[in-house]
């Protein structure tokens, strides 16, 4: 019977399945809420839910509110980490930021104080991302951001736009991040000035994207930094592999262990409701997505961890239904 069910599932159009799953999970947004502690993020429609899945040959399937623009927030930490490694080299970066998961909140300061010498645990938490922002090449926030934008343009084929209202909203409420930055400056992990670093970090978080954009980045990472549509290596292979490992172990805030265990794909979330995920080619032996894929999801209602509530449900469902886990 199981074999018959599997044969039947092969005949079902993945696009139709995605549409059905999106509409099934959309009402669950009522159990979460948008990140209204950042005023500009609290203005969105919480019931939005969309997904885009991109394959190496350029085939794209999507459903729901897939073309809605949103700010990358913590998804951008993957990009800044890649940019820092490409410009400074992996040893230089890892001398300043570790690769260990932490059970603390993403904006916590406690481990910086109790674990000397105060090295941030990983680049996916705010302390680590601030440190990364400070070591991007350039003598000013403008130059550092220009380098970051150039990396983004290489990946998605267009220069990212900054959502000025979100940036201003975060700038005016960045009290915890300022505290983190000053502590990192005092312990000599922050290489730029505090306000300069904050500008870089908050503007990278305010970069606008769609599910298609982050699905493309996920696809490139799935292929170890190789852009399968442009047939070009755009991220060094060792950097891409390290970024994927960090996404798997640290990418979903304090729920990273749960996602690794029950979803089983590298993923990175942001408090705006985005999730960037990927399935490497080696993960599947049959369709769909036998050649790997990138996944972009948007659902602004977030859970207690800061992850998209409906987006996480959708990702878990499709990973289990299509057996996408890398384990």
From Swiss-Prot:
The keyword Transferase does not apply. The keyword Hydrolase applies. Gene3D superfamilies: 1.10.1500.10, DD-peptidase/beta-lactamase superfamily (3.40.710.10). GO terms for molecular function: glutaminase activity. GO terms for biological process: glutamate biosynthetic process; glutamine catabolic process. InterPro entries: Beta-lactam/transpept-like, Glutaminase. It is an enzyme of class 3 (hydrolase). Keywords: Hydrolase. Pfam families: Glutaminase. It catalyses: L-glutamine + H2O = L-glutamate + NH4(+). Its EC number is 3.5.1.2. Substrate binds at residues 74, 126, 170, 177, 201, 253, 271. Belongs to the glutaminase family. Homotetramer. This is Glutaminase 1. The gene is glsA1.
């Amino acid at each position: 019977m199981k074999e018959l069910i599997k044969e039947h599932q092969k005949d079902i159009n993945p696009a139709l399945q995605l549409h059905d799953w999106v509409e099934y999970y959309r009402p669950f947004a009522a159990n979460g809420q948008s990140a209204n502690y950042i005023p500009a993020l609290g203005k969105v429609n919480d019931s939005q839910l969309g997904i885009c899945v991109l394959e190496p040959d350029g085939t794209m399937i999507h459903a729901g509110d897939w073309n809605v623009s949103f700010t990358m927030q913590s998804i951008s930490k993957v990009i800044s980490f890649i940019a820092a490694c490409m410009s400074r080299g992996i040893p230089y970066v890892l001398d300043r930021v570790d690769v260990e998961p932490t059970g603390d909140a993403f904006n916590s300061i406690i481990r910086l104080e109790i674990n000397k010498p105060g090295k941030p645990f990983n680049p996916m938490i705010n302390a680590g991302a601030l440190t990364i922002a400070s070591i991007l090449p350039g003598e000013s926030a403008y130059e550092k951001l220009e380098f970051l934008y150039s990396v983004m343009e290489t990946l998605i084929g267009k220069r990212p736009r900054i959502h000025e209202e979100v940036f201003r909203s975060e700038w005016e409420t960045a009290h915890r991040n300022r505290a983190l930055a000053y502590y990192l400056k005092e312990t000599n992990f922050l290489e730029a000035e505090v306000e300069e670093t904050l500008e870089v970090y908050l503007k990278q978080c305010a970069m606008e994207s769609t599910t298609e954009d982050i699905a493309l980045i996920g696809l490139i990472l799935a292929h170890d930094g190789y852009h399968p549509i442009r047939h070009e290596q755009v991220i060094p292979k060792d950097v891409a592999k390290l970024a994927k490992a960090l996404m798997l172990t640290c990418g979903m805030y304090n729920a990273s262990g749960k996602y690794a265990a029950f979803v089983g794909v590298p993923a990175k979330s942001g408090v705006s409701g985005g999730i960037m995920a990927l399935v490497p080619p080696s993960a599947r032996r049959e369709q769909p997505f036998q050649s790997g894929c990138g996944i972009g999801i948007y659902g602004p209602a977030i859970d207690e961890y800061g992850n998209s509530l409906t987006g996480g449900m959708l990702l878990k469902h499709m990973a289990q239904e299509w057996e996408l886990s890398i384990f």
